[in-house]
Amino acid sequence: MSGNTLGTLFTVTTFGESHGPAIGCVIDGCPPGMGLTEADIQIELDRRKPGTSRHVTQRQEADEVEILSGVFEGVTTGTPIALLIRNTDQRSKDYGNIVETFRPGHADYTYWQKYGIRDYRGGGRSSARLTAPIVGAGAVAKKWLRERFGVEVRGYMSGLGEIDVPFVDWSYVHENPFFSPNAAVVPELEAYMDALRNDGDSIGARIDVVASGVPVGWGEPVFDRLDADIAKAMMSINAVKGVEIGAGFDSVAQRGSVHGDELTPAGFVGNHAGGVLGGISTGQDITVSIAIKPTSSIRTPRRSITKSGDEATVETFGRHDPCVGIRATPIAESMLALVLIDHALRHRAQCGDVETSTPKIAGSAT
């Protein structure tokens, strides 16, 4: 299997399966000299880990990270950083009924047809469990971006099923299991998820991510555009079926006189472009939204086929998130941070000494 590495200069290669002994990643290209401890990474992993509320999978994993290499006396050395997270609460017997059948909407059928073998236990390599190492690597990227450039990457849930979650304030995001920026909506979200769980069904979600403090100039046209790499990274997250940057699909109904963000000496007027023009960062906030499909593993009986092609009915009895979007905010933040640190290093390598006589205007004129 190839395609396990993200990035060009700052690379992350993940490994492991949902019910294997451990999962993890190897980070290559991290600059030396940055203070880094397991606690720096654990705080992000704890935001993503399972079993934190009744609305997510009840698989109990501590997700305790071990730094195996790349750090000496609490400082990055510039050599590969290996992160290990041991699996401790696998329950593979729950998947005995899908050894010979394929779950609708899951990767079972495609993995089998491509490789001729699949790890049916918890989805194996295709499981969202493999987003834990991404969050671990994202913690490293976030720390470097914050300390080197003052970049902050934050996200929140902006929609759950048919429920819109209007943004109110960042302070609410860390006070509820949904990463909702609106405290008033949380009771409605809880009631919705309770009813969904009783129905044995699942639902999707929308997550918004914002990176503030990104300097102008990051991005490598034509085929490594910053927004193209962001879209690829976001689409690499399990269950993501759509990505918007800036106004996204709303751009279709906007006139050029509205969508084009005017420039003034005081700064940009609007940010419909989402902080990227021509594949290069503008110095404005980078705004990204992702659409996450409903969880494929549900208790509701579904039609499928066996390996022999015969008709079958599938019910999934494992411990699954009724909405994977509930825990997706730290994952989306991490993916954006990983793309940004990679492009920061690429920009420094080629254009770090470039200066122009044009002043760098503010991201917003207001």
Swiss-Prot record:
Superkingdom field:
Bacteria
- InterPro entries from the xrefs? Chorismate_synth, Chorismate_synth_AroC_sf, Chorismate_synthase_CS
Q: What is its EC number?
A: 4.2.3.5
Q: Which GO terms describe its cellular component?
A: cytosol
The record's cofactor note says: Reduced FMN (FMNH(2)).
- UniProt pathway: Metabolic intermediate biosynthesis; chorismate biosynthesis; chorismate from D-erythrose 4-phosphate and phosphoenolpyruvate: step 7/7
UniProt: FMN binding residues: 125-127, 238-239, 278, 293-297, 319
A Pfam family per the record: Chorismate_synt
Q: Where does NADP(+) bind?
A: 48, 54
Family matches, as PROSITE patterns = CHORISMATE_SYNTHASE_1, CHORISMATE_SYNTHASE_2, CHORISMATE_SYNTHASE_3
Q: State the oligomer form and interacting partners.
A: Homotetramer.
Q: Hey, which family's this protein in?
A: Belongs to the chorismate synthase family.
What is this protein's record name? Chorismate synthase
Record gene name: aroC
